[in-house]
UniProtKB/Swiss-Prot annotation:
Pfam families: Topoisom_bac, Toprim, Toprim_C_rpt. The keyword Transferase does not apply. Monomer. Interacts with mRNA interferase MazF4. Interacts with DNA-binding protein HupB. It comes from Mycobacterium tuberculosis (strain ATCC 25618 / H37Rv). InterPro entries: Topo_IA (IPR000380), Topo_IA_2 (IPR003601), Topo_IA_AS (IPR023406), Topo_IA_cen (IPR013497), Topo_IA_cen_sub1 (IPR013824), Topo_IA_cen_sub2 (IPR013825), Topo_IA_cen_sub3 (IPR013826), Topo_IA_core_domain (IPR023405). This is DNA topoisomerase 1. The gene is topA. Keywords: DNA-binding, Isomerase, Magnesium, Metal-binding, Topoisomerase. GO terms for molecular function: DNA binding; DNA topoisomerase type I (single strand cut, ATP-independent) activity; magnesium ion binding; ribonuclease inhibitor activity. Residues 1-20, 746-765, 842-892, 905-934 are annotated as: Disordered.
Amino acid sequence: MADPKTKGRGSGGNGSGRRLVIVESPTKARKLASYLGSGYIVESSRGHIRDLPRAASDVPAKYKSQPWARLGVNVDADFEPLYIISPEKRSTVSELRGLLKDVDELYLATDGDREGEAIAWHLLETLKPRIPVKRMVFHEITEPAIRAAAEHPRDLDIDLVDAQETRRILDRLYGYEVSPVLWKKVAPKLSAGRVQSVATRIIVARERDRMAFRSAAYWDILAKLDASVSDPDAAPPTFSARLTAVAGRRVATGRDFDSLGTLRKGDEVIVLDEGSATALAAGLDGTQLTVASAEEKPYARRPYPPFMTSTLQQEASRKLRFSAERTMSIAQRLYENGYITYMRTDSTTLSESAINAARTQARQLYGDEYVAPAPRQYTRKVKNAQEAHEAIRPAGETFATPDAVRRELDGPNIDDFRLYELIWQRTVASQMADARGMTLSLRITGMSGHQEVVFSATGRTLTFPGFLKAYVETVDELVGGEADDAERRLPHLTPGQRLDIVELTPDGHATNPPARYTEASLVKALEELGIGRPSTYSSIIKTIQDRGYVHKKGSALVPSWVAFAVTGLLEQHFGRLVDYDFTAAMEDELDEIAAGNERRTNWLNNFYFGGDHGVPDSVARSGGLKKLVGINLEGIDAREVNSIKLFDDTHGRPIYVRVGKNGPYLERLVAGDTGEPTPQRANLSDSITPDELTLQVAEELFATPQQGRTLGLDPETGHEIVAREGRFGPYVTEILPEPAADAAAAAQGVKKRQKAAGPKPRTGSLLRSMDLQTVTLEDALRLLSLPRVVGVDPASGEEITAQNGRYGPYLKRGNDSRSLVTEDQIFTITLDEALKIYAEPKRRGRQSASAPPLRELGTDPASGKPMVIKDGRFGPYVTDGETNASLRKGDDVASITDERAAELLADRRARGPAKRPARKAARKVPAKKAAKRD
């Protein structure tokens, strides 16, 4: 590693007294320039200016013959990396060198984490300045912070640079040694990575659990009870309670069953079926129940710590439906424009000035009683103290309220505002008083025949909201649960009170498979396992999606069959490389390098070549990564790793998913015409998730003719029309006649070229309401007629068409696409209706209707329009295109009926349009000056 203080070998210096400040981005440069004044020139490097070669063509000619050239790391010379200036950054480097000639000092003002320190070091090594170099570090972009950083620079942190370089080299060695194994044994263009492969394994392991899961059924009774019979003033007079015990034995609930549907402790609980639950309810008919006990307890809930990187990603995913990548992109903008502090941090601590700012703001907005009696300090064990900046909070010594910044961040930047508001709420709430309330637990008894039954009800009321005035934590929709401020009121009852039974409902349940990971829950899992670092989570999640290992279904992360094959290969032949504890241990050792407690050369040598000790003990002692790959490569059976056994059919024949070059397919051996075992195959659509591939589904796919089901002839062309199951779902297509060609031409390959250059058959994906086994010729011809010309826009003269795409039905006018609510609209929408859609402002991101509906329902009897269920910011909702109504607790997307959907819409219309809460009259307080913004 070069000495950062090296001078006299590059450009710079003319006695002008000016300073050059280099940052990563133009936005950051403009902001700093506005604060530093004319004595400083602020320019950006636009990210990293050099890196390891990305491809063989990037390797300089003099190194191409070296055995290590493909790695870009000289493994025989202390793992010296080969850095090249990125082609697109050469002009930037030239500009920076030119600016150095007119200044007397260089300030490297890149971010203060590993990555920022590395960028600063690369700038130093590339520019080779002959003038004094200083490292300028700040964690928020406000005028006081920037001026303080310029007045108190520090030296470059070489330990931090070493840590980043070690990670970069490690990831290069891991990726460039293991990825070629995947190319040879699974498929081209795949990649392996130190963290991405483990993240993929976590998701695959969860899907395996779902595939092995067996649901268990159980019943109980939901009772609606009336307390007014013994207390006319009871409030509320009616409430619900659930059956919890019969004849002294606890009634089984979902948590009493394991993942295979077996009772964990069968002798301690009673499992009710529909018949026994119905009989118990009948036995209670005409009786009263009695309050056996009523226990009321106070509770208090402390506020949550301010955000760090991982918790911001999790909560933005849950509350705002942002991906981890989107969250970090918006946070980067907010930071660079001076709205928040640095967004890559493992810390939950606040500075003294930030604590005072939060407490002052809470007092002004909510009153003295809402502020914690003493400042709250949040500490946690930080993996790397050198990266432990302050928590993510609003920038400045006084915080700009959401109302104050709304005007600046509204409109096209509304997502920036929403994330700022979330950060502001969490920060202010962290210094507020506890939320307080009461819980009430009721135990209610009765007799069903000769058996004593026990019902239970639990209520919760909030007596003092405390920090919940500012911030309410949400829950992951796929996991279930209630938000912090959810209340359930019960009447205040005393033992011995009699209760009338209003209604008894035998209630059936089934255990659910473990929920798939969402981006939020995957980030939480990675953090709990100590795998990766919060600053890398968003890029890891993006990578595993870009590589085709994972795709999203709603907000859930679903693994592909390729991910199953890759994970299986790595587990079987490179088990330690995807072991959770091993990967976490590597992270800890890399942090030791950052702290200066470990030499990176020794560590890399043990990992790559082997040794007697070091982080990767099992890898080091087996000869290192290089030997591990060499030994295993030839022994890997490609067919075996690309074969995932599902189950046996009813004849005991194993059914496999095979991962082929054209996608996954099903296969089993059946008796052929000669009696010999013959492979039977079936196309496997990507739309079928692994846990949905049951024996019944497999048999249906095997029964589907692979050449497709013939529907008939197109009366216009005479071409045969068939329906097929494809990789991307069921579709219809036409069979074109073979082009004519004489034998001589065919022998020379002309026929093959004619076919390639000839007309392509028309195809059309089936609508969601269609089924491969029942689709008709008429349906197919309608699909093949798309896109349908709706008409011509009289204003622009452009043609408007209705089409069906990967993300659902949509309109297209030139380059402007607008989503439709239902697939039927493709064939029914009129020009006037289309023009109305185009007259509305185009909505962006989650506000747009680009995502297909979760489910299509029937027609709403009130509006006469089709109803669909869509995925919205606050969860699933039903809409007829005019009225939106959120699904309520107990409503299930898969089973909700047309009648229930219409009921929700009718109820929403009856309540009228949503109204904004009236502003409270605020006490007059002296106005605080917000941080200066340009």
